[in-house]
């Protein structure tokens, strides 16, 4: 058996290698601390997919196995794309999970749907600035994706399409499911730039923390975050705490302040009101004349990102000033109501102009807590 230190790095698969008698390695797409992602081609159909390979000799055990578990939970859910081959967990000679043994094989892998460019890459191509139209529509997709993940009892933690640090926030016993009790002092887990201010205090992360990450990401779509140039996680945490919601969302539609006000009303145990956040984002679309079928910024050829629907409609609502303790009564804050008779509801907006998921999708509470 290879020594642990010799095999703990990213898995290197030569181009042309056939894995599991089915997948031929075509190109290397990227790598991390203990894994690598490859472009592969199925021998029989020439269909292309992404393969993530992970060393079996990584201290702390497999994280790929957790990713597969999350993807299996997501299988069959609306608008969720898990894996090209049912998230099957296999080792380097193609056996199923019941026969898996990390002691006998150098690496493990899973084959997944091949997607296009990452959002990070598209953001860079757009000179690190998205229009309000793109910002809000991406926010809707992120919101629904997080809700789906929360419904299958996992938190995102790293806020990425990979689930290597995801954590289940419930306990299952005797056929019952209940939320875990929060720990007093946890390890710092997450992406420093986007994790919630709460995470910096080593407090237990819950569903609201994932949504704070969403808000930070949406804010960055319109301009650099206040801590963008900082590298020390303690300094970043301190800056997050002293940044007001108005400062954070300075270049975003003012309606988004109602989202942060709602998040500040939550604690670890409280379920976020996904429907409320959905309504806020939808109202922002309507007030800024944004159609869901509009092209995203990266789809527009020869047009500056600053053109078109990039300016915030500051006249559509009046947002109350957030106090220094950042606690705001959500009911006192005004945004365009989706119940207004002169304003279309999500169901009245023509297909192609509204999101592919509905208010009912956002309101559904599968866990009951």
Placement of each model-derived feature along the sequence:
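Juxta-kinase regulatory segment immediately upstream of eukaryotic protein kinase catalytic domains
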Residues: 1-18, 26-27
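Short beta-strand micro-motifs within the conserved protein kinase catalytic domain, predominantly
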Residues: 83-93, 97-108
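A conserved loop-to-beta-strand element in the N-lobe of protein kinase catalytic cores
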Residues: 104-113, 120-121
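Extended, low-complexity, intrinsically disordered C-terminal regulatory tails
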Residues: 244-251, 278-279, 286-369
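Conserved N-lobe ATP-binding subsite of Hanks-type protein kinase domains
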Residues: 36
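Activation segment signature within eukaryotic-like protein kinase domains
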Residues: 138-139
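Conserved beta3-strand ATP-binding lysine motif
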Residues: 52-56
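Activation segment/activation loop of eukaryotic-type protein kinase catalytic domains
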Residues: 160-192
């Amino acid at each position: 058996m290879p020594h642990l230190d010799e095999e703990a790095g990213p898995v290197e698969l030569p181009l042309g290698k056939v894995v599991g008698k089915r997948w031929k390695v075509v190109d290397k797409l990227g790598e991390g601390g203990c894994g690598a992602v490859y472009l592969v081609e199925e021998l029989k159909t020439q269909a292309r997919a992404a393969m993530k390979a992970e060393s079996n000799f990584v201290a702390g055990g497999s994280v790929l196995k957790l990713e597969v578990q999350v993807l299996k939970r997501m299988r069959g859910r609306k608008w969720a794309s898990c894996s090209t081959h049912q998230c099957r967990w296999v080792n380097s000679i193609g056996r199923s999970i019941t026969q898996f043994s990390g002691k006998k094989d150098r690496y493990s892998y899973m084959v997944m749907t091949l997607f296009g460019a990452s959002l990070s890459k598209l953001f860079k191509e757009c000179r690190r600035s998205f229009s309000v139209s793109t910002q809000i529509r991406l926010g809707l997709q992120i919101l629904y994706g997080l809700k789906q993940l929360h419904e299958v009892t996992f938190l995102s933690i790293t806020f990425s399409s990979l689930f290597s640090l995801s954590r289940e926030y419930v306990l299952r016993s005797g056929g019952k499911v209940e939320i875990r009790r929060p720990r007093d002092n946890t390890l710092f887990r997450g992406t420093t730039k986007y994790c919630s201010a709460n995470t910096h205090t080593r407090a237990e992360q819950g569903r609201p923390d994932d949504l704070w990450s969403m808000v930070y990401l949406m804010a960055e779509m319109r301009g650099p975050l206040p801590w963008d140039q900082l590298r020390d996680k303690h300094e970043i945490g301190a800056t997050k705490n002293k940044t007001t919601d108005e400062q954070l969302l300075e270049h975003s539609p003012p309606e988004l302040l109602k989202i942060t006000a709602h998040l500040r009303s939550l604690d670890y145990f409280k379920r976020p009101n996904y429907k409320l956040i959905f309504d806020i984002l939808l109202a922002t679309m309507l007030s800024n004349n944004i159609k869901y079928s509009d092209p995203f910024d990266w789809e527009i050829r020869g047009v500056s990102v600053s053109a078109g629907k990039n300016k915030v409609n500051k006249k559509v609502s009046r947002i109350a000033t957030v106090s220094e303790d950042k606690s705001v009564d959500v009911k006192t804050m005004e945004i365009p109501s989706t119940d207004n008779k002169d304003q279309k509801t999500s169901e009245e907006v023509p297909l192609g102009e509204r999101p592919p998921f509905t208010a009912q999708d956002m309101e559904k509470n599968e866990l009951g807590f």
